[in-house]
Amino acid sequence: MPQISRYSDEQVEQLLAELLNILEKHKAPTDLSLMVLGNMVTNLINTSIAPAQRQAIANSFARALQSSINEDKAH
């Protein structure tokens, strides 16, 4: 079942494109990109979420990430 979001597809796609452009501009390899994005997620959780909710949010984010991974062999 698809998730319902309060954000439009256009908003999400525009922000995603801008973030990807920054990574491409810096010629960031995949491992560096993942490290930076992971640090960004950690920073957002630690600075924007109440301490009592941080672990639950991190677990929810991790589950959403794992469920969105495509397991086909192409890359």
Curated annotation (Swiss-Prot):
Protein name stated in the entry: UPF0352 protein YejL
InterPro entries tied to this protein: UPF0352, YejL_sf
Family of this protein: Belongs to the UPF0352 family.
Pfam families: DUF1414
Taxonomy, superkingdom: Bacteria
Gene3D superfamilies to which the protein is assigned, alphabetical: YejL-like (1.10.3390.10)
Signal peptide coordinates: none
